[in-house]
């Protein structure tokens, strides 16, 4: 029972950290490459 409580308290923290870092990474990518729909190396 104690292991289940430990898992239930660790999983939301890890999920929050993961999605927070993923959101930060996506924000920084969109800041560096603002128009990601048309990359310059795709236009021939």
UniProtKB/Swiss-Prot annotation:
It comes from the Eukaryota. The keyword Membrane applies. Keywords: Chloroplast, Membrane, Photosynthesis, Photosystem I, Plastid, Thylakoid, Transmembrane, Transmembrane helix. The gene is psaJ. Belongs to the PsaJ family. It is a single-pass membrane protein. May help in the organization of the PsaE and PsaF subunits. This is Photosystem I reaction center subunit IX. It is found in: Plastid, Chloroplast thylakoid membrane. GO terms for cellular component: chloroplast thylakoid membrane; photosystem I. Signal peptide: none annotated. GO terms for biological process: photosynthesis. PANTHER family: PHOTOSYSTEM I REACTION CENTER SUBUNIT IX, PTHR36082.
């Amino acid at each position: 029972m104690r292991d289940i409580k430990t898992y239930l308290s660790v999983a939301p923290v890890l999920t929050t950290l993961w999605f927070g870092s993923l959101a930060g990474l996506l924000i920084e990518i969109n800041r560096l490459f603002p128009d990601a729909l048309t990359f310059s190396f795709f236009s021939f």
